[in-house]
Curated annotation (Swiss-Prot):
Its main location: nucleus. PANTHER family: T-BOX PROTEIN-RELATED, T-BOX TRANSCRIPTION FACTOR T. The keyword Nucleus applies. It comes from the Eukaryota. Involved in the transcriptional regulation of genes required for mesoderm formation and differentiation. Binds to a palindromic site (called T site) and activates gene transcription when bound to such a site. GO terms for molecular function: DNA-binding transcription factor activity, RNA polymerase II-specific; RNA polymerase II cis-regulatory region sequence-specific DNA binding. GO terms for biological process: cell fate specification; heart morphogenesis; mesoderm formation; positive regulation of DNA-templated transcription; regulation of transcription by RNA polymerase II; somitogenesis. Residues 280-310, 384-412 are annotated as: Disordered. This is T-box transcription factor T. The keyword Nucleus applies. Residues 297-310 have a biased composition (Polar residues). Coiled coil: none annotated.
Length: 435
């Protein structure tokens, strides 16, 4: 005789089991309408066959890596004609489609020799296996998790030889009974060549277009192309700007090169306000101190091939009367021959240059005073003076030069003295225009 407590527990258990059995029955019913207990009408069809055909026309390629790479297009099949109440397992393997090793030459795949020995046969078992026939028929069977590798590392991955053509095969095995039955299906449009990197750009474009997980690859490619476009103008400007680097003030936000340019004795030392660390990634491979975004600066000066015109582009400074002409100069060597001023500057040329020496020229009384002390300054303790003497100012010269004191000293730490190596001797004499 059972106790009332046992009867209550039995009713509670029966209640819980009922809803579980109901869920199982619903699962068994799904897909049963496509079932056939005799299995005489078993059919397996390829999903996305039109997409597979587009890839086949171009000779499809699949990436193989050491850690394994998933396939695209994803292999999916729809199944009908299974016994809804029988148990089945779905398996996938790959067989060689021909007896060639392939190579990509002049935009097409051609046979390239004898194939390598086939790796041990690897079989991928669908993770839903085993399951009822009704389960397999209710929705397309997707092999989205299979990974292709070129290393024998196990883990359910399929090992393939690179540059060999393969064809996937799907096997359906009936399990759970006394008799094992198996049926195999393959689709020629799913053939592909295993590669470690895509060879055909059209295949790459199709993969990016139809694979939602390839959008990151597309974005990375666009960023890379944009970076290349940004670097190209920077590289082309390098040759034109590097020789005028001494015209840039010390407060510039441009970076010195990691390795000095061969024609300079060494990089210029810039003040602590320098913004070099803003572009740390450019220091290891750029010989020019100008990073690629330099072309987008709105306040960038306009450079001219005429050195005389460049001399006149510097801002005026109120300390001109206190400056004199040193016995040597820290101006870097030039690779261009200078001609007469072109008149592109708002100031006339203030210097008369001849045979490697710098001579102050005449300046009108109403002219703005001098050049900033941060330009043309070097350390007299380390620089090698030029062999030419600096002539005295002419009688008609500006009174600003008469009795001018010695040039203002600038700390050695601000500039590297090795940059004041020499001055080219091909300057053309320039006379200031009459006012």
């Amino acid at each position: 005789m059972s106790s009332p407590g046992a009867e209550s527990a039995g009713k509670s258990l029966q209640y819980r089991v009922d809803h579980l059995l109901s869920a199982v029955e619903s699962e068994l019913q799904a897909g049963s309408e496509k079932g056939d207990p005799t299995e005489r009408e078993l059919r397996v069809g390829l999903e996305d066959s039109e997409l597979w055909l587009r890839f086949k026309e171009l000779t499809n390629e699949m990436i193989v890596t050491k850690n394994g790479r998933r396939m695209f297009p994803v292999l999916k099949v729809n199944v009908s004609g299974l016994d809804p109440n029988a148990m089945y397992s779905f398996l996938l393997d790959f067989v060689a489609a021909d007896n060639h090793r392939w190579k990509y030459v002049n935009g097409e795949w051609v046979p390239g020799g004898k194939p390598e020995p086939q790796a041990p046969s690897c079989v991928y078992i669908h993770p839903d296996s085993p399951n009822f026939g009704a389960h397999w028929m209710k929705a397309p069977v997707s092999f989205s998790k299979v990974k292709l590798t070129n290393k024998l590392n196990g883990g359910g991955q399929i090992m393939l030889n690179s540059l060999h053509k393969y064809e996937p095969r799907i096997h359906i095995v009936r399990v759970g009974g006394a008799q094992r039955m198996i049926t195999s299906h393959c689709f020629p449009e799913t053939q592909f060549i295993a590669v470690t990197a895509y060879q055909n750009e059209e295949i790459t474009a199709l993969k990016i277009k139809y694979n939602p997980f390839a959008k990151a690859f597309l974005d990375a490619k666009e960023r890379s192309d944009h970076k290349d476009m940004m670097e190209e103008p920077g590289d082309s400007q390098q040759s034109g700007y590097s020789q005028w680097g001494w015209l840039i003030p010390g407060t510039s936000t441009l970076c010195p090169p990691a390795t000095p340019h061969p024609q300079f004795g060494g990089p210029l030392s810039l003040p602590s306000t320098h913004g070099c660390e803003r572009y740390p990634a450019l220091r290891n491979h750029r010989p020019s101190p100008y990073p690629s975004p330099y072309a987008h600066r709105n306040n960038s000066p306009t450079y001219s091939d005429n050195p005389s015109a460049c001399l006149s582009m510097l801002q005026s400074h109120d300390s001109w009367p206190s400056l004199g002409t040193p016995a040597h100069t820290s101006m870097l060597p030039m690779s261009h021959s200078a001609g007469p001023p072109t008149g592109s500057s708002q100031y006339p040329s203030l210097w008369s240059v001849s045979n490697g020496t710098i001579t102050p020229g005449a300046q009108p009384a109403g002219m703005s005073n001098g050049l900033g002390a941060q330009f043309f300054r070097g350390s007299s303790a380390h620089g090698a003076p030029l062999g030419h003497a600096v002539p005295a100012p002419s009688a008609s010269g500006s009174p600003l030069y008469e009795g001018a004191p010695t040039a203002t000293d600038v700390p050695d730490s601000q500039y590297d003295a090795s940059a004041q190596a020499r001055l080219i001797a091909s300057w053309t004499p320039v006379s200031p225009p009459s006012m």
